[in-house]
A protein has these predicted regions:
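A generic structural signal for short, solvent-exposed coil/turn residues
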Residues: 5, 9-12, 133-135, 185-187
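Residues at the start of alpha-helices and the adjacent loop-to-helix junctions
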Residues: 6, 12, 39-40, 113, ...
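Conserved, well-structured interaction surfaces
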Residues: 73-184
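A broad, low-specificity signal marking well-ordered, structured residues that form hydrophobic/aromatic
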Residues: 46, 139, 191
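Solvent-exposed, flexible loop/coil residues
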Residues: 28-33, 143-145, 187
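Membrane-proximal, proline-rich intrinsically disordered regions
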Residues: 20-85, 89, 93-96, 100, ...
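Short, intrinsically disordered, charge-balanced linker/junction segments flanking boundaries
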Residues: 186-194
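Bacterial Sec-dependent N-terminal signal peptides
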Residues: 1-30
Length: 194
């Protein structure tokens, strides 16, 4: 019995010492990861559009269940079931997928002087943040894409967000009306208008 106890103590100490190693954190760091800055602008746009449309679909399905838009007149209670797997899916898609992709698209468009890509980024941002504030009221907006440095963004007032959504759309109209002087022009990567 004493031997089993000693072996258990030695194993516990060995596991504890190994788990405290700093080299453990290098295990899950991908060696071939691509930095967002090195991705071509025409490869960022489809991701931003897809994340936006997924978020819109998630919001539509959630609201349609509440409003009974997807209900039918069947008498059987098991026939007409439409369930959302997660109630936070819209929020997750907007803040962890759509807005970060749009931020990268905005930065890349600004760096390459691609006015039409920048206009698309502004429209997508207005769509995402506009519907988010419609659904939830005051939401994180100004600090929303600073996740790498700020895990707790402050909530911005809905009126400020609506004012900025209108400004984003006005800016996009101006950018769309100006000639694109960049070599990067939206084409097949624009999943909506191509």
């Amino acid at each position: 019995m004493k031997n089993i106890f000693k072996i258990a103590i030695v194993l516990t100490l060995a596991i504890t010492i190994y788990s405290c190693s700093d080299s453990y954190y290098d295990t899950n760091t991908p060696s071939n990861a691509v930095a967002p800055e090195s991705v071509a602008i025409n490869n960022i746009l489809p991701s931003a559009i897809q994340a936006t449309m997924s978020a819109q679909y998630s919001a539509a399905v959630s609201l349609a269940q509440v409003d009974q838009h997807i209900a039918s007149a069947f008498n059987d209670q098991n026939i007409d079931k439409h369930y959302q797997n997660s109630l936070d899916e819209y929020w997750r898609l907007v803040y962890s997928k759509a807005l970060p992709n749009i931020k990268v698209l905005e930065d890349k468009a600004t760096a390459t002087n691609s006015s039409h890509y920048l206009a698309i980024a502004k429209v997508l941002k207005a769509i995402n943040i506009g519907l988010t504030t419609d659904l939830h009221g005051d939401v994180p907006y100004i600090e929303a894409t600073l996740a790498a440095t700020n895990f707790y963004p402050k909530y911005d007032a809905q009126q400020i967000i609506y004012t900025d959504v209108i400004k984003l759309l006005d800016d996009a109209i101006v950018l769309f009306s100006t000639p694109n002087t960049s070599i990067s022009t939206p084409g097949a990567d624009d999943l909506i208008y191509s």
